[in-house]
């Protein structure tokens, strides 16, 4: 997500343009385009499966190029197409297996440090934050396979979703639990402001040097600045049409809490910095 504009254009827009040209050349029956919820940008409110032009907040190269790549497919008239916008894809729900580190994984080293530094009986607080749509890769594969073969769906866009999503606060709470870290209580922004108001004003500078601390954490763990936008993610995705179709095939996204342990264990054993350096 932190790559520069040129690299993103070449990979996302240029790659899609070449793939469409190939599909036309071989006279493919249908072009199946894997887009992303990023095509909606940072739209404030509910973004449906039928919305596209309404996307806003496309300043980031990743959002911009995902949107522009999908636009190429939508304008295509020489071949039939279907578009899939999965959420934030993580590892296999049973094994935790994953081949890359991005999205929530950026924050795993920091969560591990907190878990190692603080006792499990300690109770901490965190704001609830925005809702994130996280999906395990095996669910995405099963969902796309079913949707690709569903009759009469050409020209449609699908959200293979976690129908409930998970707030940033609950995501951190579940990951801390998987890492055997401190227990986390989730509060809304108003409650946190009320709590901070009880701290003597003279002590605030020593309590929350937030900007400096946040910058140090991001630099230490290589967290891209753009990844912080997930903390207050403003978009809710309506996946009513997709969920109705998937229900016919008995396909349903498991809640993140049910497979967080597998995701965490696989990361520690295979994707953590020291695990990768030892390969």
Q: How would you name each of these model-derived features?
A:
Residues 21-22, 56-87, 92:
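Active-site Tyr-X1-5-Lys
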Residues 12-18, 130-143, 148, 161-167, ...:
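C-terminal, well-structured subdomains that either form a transmembrane helix-short loop-helix hairpin
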Residues 13-19, 65-73, 107, 140:
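Conserved catalytic Lys-bearing alpha helix of Rossmann-like short-chain dehydrogenase/reductases
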Residues 108-125, 131-183:
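Alpha-helical substrate-binding/gating segment
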């Amino acid at each position: 997500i932190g790559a520069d504009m040129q690299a993103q254009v070449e990979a996302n827009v240029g790659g899609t343009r070449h793939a469409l040209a190939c599909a036309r050349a071989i006279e493919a029956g249908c072009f199946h385009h894997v887009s992303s919820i990023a095509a909606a940008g940072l739209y404030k409110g509910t973004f449906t499966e039928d919305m596209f032009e309404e996307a806003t907040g496309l300043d980031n190269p990743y959002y911009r190029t995902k949107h522009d790549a999908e636009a190429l497919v939508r304008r295509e008239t020489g071949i039939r197409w279907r578009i899939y916008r999965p959420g934030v894809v993580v590892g296999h729900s049973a094994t935790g297996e994953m081949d890359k580190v991005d999205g929530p994984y950026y924050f795993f080293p920091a969560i591990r440090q907190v878990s190692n530094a603080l006792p499990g009986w300690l109770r901490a607080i965190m704001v609830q934050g925005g809702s994130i749509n996280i999906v395990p890769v095996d669910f995405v594969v099963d969902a796309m396979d079913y949707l690709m073969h569903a009759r009469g769906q050409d020209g449609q866009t699908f959200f293979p979703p976690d129908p409930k999503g998970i707030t940033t606060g609950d995501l951190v709470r579940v990951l801390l639990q998987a890492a055997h870290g401190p227990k986390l209580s989730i509060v809304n922004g108003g409650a946190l402001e009320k709590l901070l108001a009880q701290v003597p004003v003279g002590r605030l500078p020593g309590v929350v040097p937030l900007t400096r601390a946040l910058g140090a954490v991001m630099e230490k763990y290589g967290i891209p600045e753009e990844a912080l936008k997930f903390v207050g993610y403003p978009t809710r995705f309506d996946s009513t049409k997709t969920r109705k179709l998937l229900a016919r095939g008995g396909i349903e996204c498991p809640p993140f809490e049910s497979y967080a342990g597998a995701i965490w264990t696989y990361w520690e054993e295979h994707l953590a910095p020291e695990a990768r350096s030892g390969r």
